[in-house]
Regions:
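Conserved P-loop NTPase
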Residues: 13-14, 123, 127-132, 204-263, ...
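Walker A/P-loop NTP-binding active-site region of P-loop NTPases
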Residues: 26-92, 268-330
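Conserved nucleotide-binding/hydrolysis micro-motifs of P-loop NTPases
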Residues: 72-76, 84, 104-108, 143-145, ...
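P-loop NTPase motor core
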Residues: 37, 113-194, 199, 291, ...
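Short glycine-/polar-rich loops that comprise or flank the Walker A/P-loop
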Residues: 34, 62-65, 96, 169-171, ...
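Terminal-proximal interaction/regulatory segments of ATP-powered molecular machines
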Residues: 291, 297, 313, 506-517
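Conserved inter-motif catalytic segment of the P-loop NTP-binding fold
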Residues: 62-149, 305-389
Length: 517
């Protein structure tokens, strides 16, 4: 059967893995072997870093020597900059695994005489490829060539000749080029993309008040790839792409329940939250969201589970003080190695960097529970699409690692119904707890409701909810009131005789069930 499959299966072009985090996912396995890829972007988008990482990973993971042709930076600067990421290029050069071909402008600024001709460079490059048996080549960047010479038509012809020679040598090549706009022509001189089999665009777009890095594969000739833009960040290990579209809903669904830390809330949820589920507590400020998060974290730690709390609105000291007033000692749990609290301002960095920090902390600490307080703080100043992608990234990674996540969301509306569908967060979460203020007989009261819980029975009632010195106290439903959610509850007139019979009957049912047990 295997032979039959081999005969009838359509051949797929062989690919070379870049080992750049996330890129091999969105490119369905890497770059086509022996082909040229154009990496285009505005200044500072990470083109040189991407291409250098492609070379370094080829040497590190596959023992594939590489050649780097530089038209802009000096070899000294390239080697120096690579040290930031822990890449010892000088050591690789000394070992004969990497060669940097310097085609950067003469610092003396000599006048250009005669016709433009890349023949000498092509011969030097061919010699280096054969001498070092290079499999990967980077040319950074051809825009510098166009800027030095005026004969654009001649340069195009020479670049085409260079690409053709590289194809003959069967090396996998990345050529970088500048563009002037984030969304516009692929490259400055309009035809660079036609001399390349593959085009990758990197962007650093200002969205709202923050910049957001994305990568898009425009084409991979003769093979498949994922469409659209994918967020990425630059860490101390290089480019890190988040292949959100490559995430598959393949995680196992657990029937195991975990406690919220509040007995009444567990009962309202049919026995607690499902393990590996994502819970969202949404409500106005002061409704008790952070308290529920604290009880959830405390319960996990009391059971010997590790937990991480990512806080974006309060400092560590403030969180510890508030938790202590409810009898929860965060500092003790941290000393025991069961809890890690990470506090940072949402505006301190972009969403992709926040996502990378969350993933990195989870990978290092290996918690069973995580909490984010709050998502709404992270949503400030970013587009709905960027925020949704962030939430998908966090929830997807938590489910992949089989972690129970508890997130909070602060609504703008102080009283009355509020939207929980902004940025479509509600569709991504498994359980939603709605917390709100209501006015009853001239006094403010809090209400809690299990708005949604996937795969489980849950209490549909809207219950009164108090915050005491011991934590949350959930009472009975607001019986005899309607329109609680609207924020303008009205008392329902009742038949006193019928209500008395209902109370008597409930006691009789309880007595009979106690007798039978």
């Amino acid at each position: 059967s295997h032979k039959l499959f081999t005969v009838y299966c359509r051949p797929v072009r062989e690919k070379i893995r870049t080992m750049i985090e996330g890129f091999d996912d969105i490119s369905h396995g890497g770059l086509p072997v022996g082909r040229t890829t154009l990496v285009s972007g505005t200044s500072g988008t990470g083109k040189t870093l991407f291409s250098l990482q492609f070379l370094f990973n080829g040497i590190s993971y596959f023992e594939e020597p590489g050649v780097f042709v530089t038209f802009e930076e000096s070899p000294h600067d390239i080697i120096k900059n690579a040290h930031i990421f822990g890449w010892d290029l000088q050591g690789l050069i000394n070992d004969g695994k990497l060669f940097i071909l310097d085609a950067s402008p003469d610092p003396e600024g000599q006048d250009i005489v005669g016709n433009f001709d890349l023949s000498a460079l092509i011969e030097r490059l061919q010699y280096a490829i054969r001498k070092y048996r290079a499999k990967r080549v980077v040319i950074d960047s051809i825009t510098a060539v166009f800027q030095q010479y005026e004969a654009v038509g001649v340069i195009r012809r020479e670049i085409f000749r260079l690409v053709a020679r590289l194809k003959q040598l069967n090396v996998t090549t990345i050529i970088t080029t500048e563009r002037t706009e984030e969304y516009g022509p692929v490259a400055c001189f309009g035809v660079e993309e036609f001399v390349s089999d593959n085009v990758v665009i990197v962007r650093n777009v200002l969205e709202g008040e923050r910049r957001r890095r994305t990568v898009e594969i425009l084409k991979l000739r003769g093979t498949t790839h994922m469409k659209g833009e994918y967020p990425f960040t630059i860490t101390n290990e290089g480019v890190n792409i988040f292949p959100l579209g490559a995430m598959r809903l393949t995680q196992r669904s657990s029937n195991v329940r975990v406690s919220s830390g509040v007995k009444t809330l567990d009962d309202m949820c049919g026995g607690g939250f499902f393990k590996d589920s994502i819970i969202l507590a949404t409500g106005a400020t002061g409704t008790g969201k952070t308290l529920l998060v604290s009880k959830f974290i405390q319960n996990g730690c009391q059971n010997g589970e590790r937990a991480i709390l990512f806080a974006y609105e309060e400092s560590r000291a403030q969180l510890s003080r508030n938790a202590s007033s409810w009898g929860i000692e965060f500092e003790d749990l941290e000393r025991q190695g069961l809890l890690k609290i990470i506090c940072t301002y949402p505006e301190s960095t972009g969403l992709e960097d926040h996502l990378q920090i969350i993933k990195s902390e989870i990978a290092d600490f290996k918690p069973s529970r995580i909490a984010i307080d709050s998502l709404s703080a992270l949503a400030r100043g970013v587009s709905n699409n960027a925020f949704r992608q962030f939430v998908i990234g966090v929830t997807g990674y938590a489910k992949q690692e089989e972690i129970t996540g508890f997130f909070t969301n602060t609504t703008d509306q102080f009283m009355g119904s509020h939207s929980i569908t902004d940025s479509h967060i509600s569709t991504i979460t498994d359980t939603i707890l709605m917390l709100q203020y209501v006015e009853i007989r001239g006094e403010m009261a809090r209400a809690i409701n299990v708005f949604k819980m996937r795969g489980s029975w849950h209490d549909k009632g809207i219950r009164e909810y108090n915050i005491t010195a011991d934590g949350p106290e959930i009472k009975d439903s607001f019986r005899n009131y309607e329109r609680i959610v609207s924020g303008a509850p009205t008392r329902v007139s009742i038949d006193e005789k019928a209500e008395l019979s209902r109370i008597v009957k409930s006691f009789q049912d309880k007595d009979s069930s106690d007798a039978s047990s």
